[in-house]
Amino acid sequence: MSAYYNDSPARLPVNVPNTGGALPGFDDDTVVEVWCDVDGSGARPVPQEPLPHAVRGITQTLAEYQRLAAVAAWDGTRADAVRAMAAHPFVPTLAVAEELYDDLAAANRRFLPERLLR
């Protein structure tokens, strides 16, 4: 914040859209945390090397899960939220995703819109 507010150039890790493919292998609209050159004009991602094969697949899978969860949260339904949860690599089956979602939704019912509860 200081680099931006004070127009004091710095290289910092920032969460930004992957515009221009700063991190190869991810869509331009995927939010990635990469090194950026930051000053009063904003944050400009520094081009990155592709992630190592050992972590690339799971990172792409988690990015897709996060995208699906965000879409469900903004204007989706319970079914969309369950599908998002099922896309998480630690959730083994759709039945487990439904059970997890129902438990989370029940615990957070007062914060959720009705469309995510039915």
Walk through the language-model features, giving the residues of each.
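Long, compositionally biased stretches enriched for glycine and/or charged residues
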Residues: M1-R118
